[in-house]
């Protein structure tokens, strides 16, 4: 049973199966399927243990010819592992065996930056989940942050994303309303911030009615300075939402709320549980249920066009626009008449905090600006 997302590297797909407990690869044309590694059987009593881990449900990470992943169970202490194996199936090694107090059942993949791996797990010293880091050789395991639950979130089931020295993620529960959070954390463990706490609503889990959504199970994606994600429940019909917010926690927006179901069917889907994919100006995602037959949907959401913002800073005119839509160029003209000629701005934008920025002196010739694609 393949559970986690696939990793694409060159013309090869890599993945894991949680029933059968394997790491596999195949070519993107479907040929050359190979089981790279099979995890050993567990033995009891609970928590069941083995030498290498069990139930890998993660998306793998790769560096050169080395794969990295997690198992949600098994290992020497029965609480899951971090492992590595070469892309040809040799060199398997358990990098870390979780003991519960330092993490339990890591279900998602790892983020690799240099020679450091970052991930999330349940458990931890406070029992509400943890963000951890370790070196790619297995040394230096560190709990960067342990969730407490009520204030900061609980159960970070989804994986992390990395931008610069900042990690972003979601917590399925906890927060002031117990409906989950979006958080940020520096890679050295400092600067934890709850970017958003999903608001309280009416009803009881999982049938909570709230405009924002509740219980974000999937991870985030980042485009420019905007984070996009899904909430598994909540919304106007308690069937989940798609949301966006800025990386500083401002500007939370519900992009879509999934409609009510009758016998688990509806027109757009219910319970989005996976991360989104952004291509151009369109988000794509899946739902666990709903749709015409109740078996889930694949959906898309067209994002609103990016806006050009103009501000005055001392003697300069500062123009900014998001970086999340490729191919946009800044153009200007000296008049808006029918004979207006728009020319591409000669000054290239500088990217600052996920925004394209162009600065012009106010003393320059009066011009009108627009974005063109």
Task: Label each PLM-derived region with a short phrase.
Residues 1-316:
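Extracellular beta-propeller repeat domains
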Residues 303-373:
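Short, composition-biased motifs enriched in small/polar/acidic residues
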